[in-house]
């Protein structure tokens, strides 16, 4: 159907972003293809050491899934913070990722969790890391005729810690920060780290240079948090806009990196 209608057709999953864009005439489609009628696209299953989430699974269903809460609690908690109850009840994870709204939560956390998506077309299927799916603000790297059908997230391991925090004043978040740490000894040392920032840049961005500063003993890492925050801000290429100045956003990154670090450790925010 998508190959038949081509650019005249839009993919409808939850519609929370799509219908708003069509109402404001920033998107115009003559046809909408409803994925919610496709059996199995709303499933949430465990397979080997991964959680497989169907593209039309709503934020609310992921938030409430016992399987997700048990195997990747950071994801369930993040989904409980998405937008509002109405959006969580109708909006889908697959639609959220494909629409690539810059001021959104899921992709930033999925980036540090090592999430990937499966996309399919009439000619075949392929898997894309979440970090390669989003090309920019409101733009994905899906090829013509491709549909996102599944999101795959690694299950948390006992020596893995992850958390997501955001700063939000208006309808959408100003900043989102995700952190994943590997620790062999109950958070006394960290052998691997992934950190990503979203909302302050066109698409979620890994702080690769910052990650090098987030490994080592807990005391060493805590001392390096300010330098790591600067590395994250540099990677995000901050600019002045209606959400605030680049300097203000850099300050937020400093504040929330420390907060999310302590949250990962199980302590209160500081």
Describe the residue ranges of each PLM region.
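C-terminal structural segment of proteins
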Residues: 1-270
């Amino acid at each position: 159907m998508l190959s038949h209608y081509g650019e005249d057709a839009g993919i409808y999953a939850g519609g929370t972003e799509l219908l708003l864009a069509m109402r404001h005439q920033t998107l115009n489609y003559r046809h909408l293809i409803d994925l919610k009628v496709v059996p199995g696209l709303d499933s949430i299953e465990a397979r080997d050491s991964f959680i497989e989430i169907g593209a039309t699974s709503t934020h609310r269903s992921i938030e409430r899934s016992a399987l997700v809460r048990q195997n990747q609690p950071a994801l369930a908690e993040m989904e409980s913070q998405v937008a509002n109850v109405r959006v969580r009840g109708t909006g889908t994870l697959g639609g959220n990722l494909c629409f690539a709204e810059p001021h959104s939560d899921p992709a930033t956390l999925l980036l540090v969790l090592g999430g990937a998506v499966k996309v399919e077309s009439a000619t075949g299927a392929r898997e894309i890391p979440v970090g390669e799916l989003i090309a920019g603000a409101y733009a994905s790297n899906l090829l013509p005729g491709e549909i996102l059908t599944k999101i795959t997230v690694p299950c948390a391991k006992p020596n893995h810690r992850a958390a997501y925090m955001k700063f939000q004043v208006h309808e959408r978040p100003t900043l989102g920060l995700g952190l994943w740490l590997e620790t062999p000894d109950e958070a006394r040392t960290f052998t691997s780290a992934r950190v990503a920032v979203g909302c302050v840049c066109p698409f979620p961005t890994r702080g690769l240079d910052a990650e090098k500063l987030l490994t080592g003993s807990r005391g060493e890492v805590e001392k390096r948090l300010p330098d790591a925050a600067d590395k994250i801000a540099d990677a995000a290429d901050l600019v002045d806009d209606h959400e605030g100045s680049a300097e203000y956003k850099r300050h937020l990154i400093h504040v929330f990196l420390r907060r999310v670090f302590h949250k990962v450790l199980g302590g209160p925010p500081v």
